[in-house]
């Protein structure tokens, strides 16, 4: 008899979901994300909001990963933004330091894209604070698809919002953990 695996063998269920994309073009920065949350092969929620304004509305962000973990990180980032007003990069680096060294924060499973009028950044639990080379960056299960689509469109005459919408649509067509229920936030750069 051939071996098989069951959900009992696999450990806790794996949560999947989301694609977050940022595009900076033409004096605007847009972060967009889809609304799907899945556990295993089941869609649990189709209209989750994973993109939001932070601080005083001068920073926007999106997350991929565990929702509670992401909101904890957003709260910590907002505290750092209060400590370092108008300095998103400094606030992000300080959060990344805490994320790597704090015993509680180290267990959080999420990634974030944040942006203000000057800079877009990806923050990871490994302490990375990365700025995109061409104003385009993506995270999450469909991130590579959205990133490829956005890179293909960045040099066209389409604006940042259109590129985000089209790229997330392409990701949703390819990635089973991404849907077409989009949330976008925009800042004038």
Swiss-Prot record:
Sections of the chain in a coiled coil: none
Name the UniProt record assigns to this protein: ATP-dependent protease subunit HslV
Its EC number(s): 3.4.25.2
Residues the record lists as binding Na(+): 172, 175, 178
Main location group: cytoplasm
UniProt keywords, alphabetically: Allosteric enzyme, Cytoplasm, Hydrolase, Metal-binding, Protease, Sodium, Threonine protease
Family affiliation: Belongs to the peptidase T1B family. HslV subfamily.
Gene3D superfamilies: Glutamine Phosphoribosylpyrophosphate, subunit 1, domain 1 (3.60.20.10)
Highest taxon listed in the record's lineage: Bacteria
Complexes and interactors: A double ring-shaped homohexamer of HslV is capped on each side by a ring-shaped HslU homohexamer. The assembly of the HslU/HslV complex is dependent on binding of ATP.
Reactions performed catalytically: ATP-dependent cleavage of peptide bonds with broad specificity
Pfam families linked: Proteasome
Location relative to the cell: Cytoplasm
Regulation: Allosterically activated by HslU binding.
GO biological process terms held by the UniProt record: proteolysis involved in protein catabolic process
Active-site residues, as the UniProt record annotates them: 18
GO CC annotations on file: HslUV protease complex; proteasome core complex
Gene that this polypeptide is encoded by: hslV
Gene Ontology MF term list: metal ion binding; threonine-type endopeptidase activity
Function per UniProt: Protease subunit of a proteasome-like degradation complex believed to be a general protein degrading machinery.
């Amino acid at each position: 008899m051939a071996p098989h695996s069951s959900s009992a063998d696999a450990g806790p269920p794996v949560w999947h979901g989301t694609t977050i994309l940022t595009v900076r073009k033409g004096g605007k920065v847009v972060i967009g994300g889809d609304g799907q949350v899945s556990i295993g092969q089941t869609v649990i929620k189709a209209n989750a909001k994973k993109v939001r304004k932070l601080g005083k509305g001068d920073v926007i962000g999106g997350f991929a990963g565990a929702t509670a973990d992401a909101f904890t990180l957003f709260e910590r980032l907002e505290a750092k933004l209060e400590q370092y007003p108008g300095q998103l990069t400094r606030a992000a680096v300080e959060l990344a330091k805490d994320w790597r060294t704090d015993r509680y924060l180290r267990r959080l499973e999420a990634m974030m894209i944040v942006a203000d009028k000057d800079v877009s950044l990806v923050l990871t639990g490994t302490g990375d604070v990365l700025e995109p080379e061409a104003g385009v960056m993506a995270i999450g299960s469909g991130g590579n698809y959205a990133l490829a689509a956005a890179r293909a469109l960045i040099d066209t005459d389409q604006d940042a919002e259109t590129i985000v919408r089209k790229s997330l649509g392409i990701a949703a067509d390819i990635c089973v953990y991404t849907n077409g229920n989009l949330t976008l936030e925009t800042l004038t750069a």
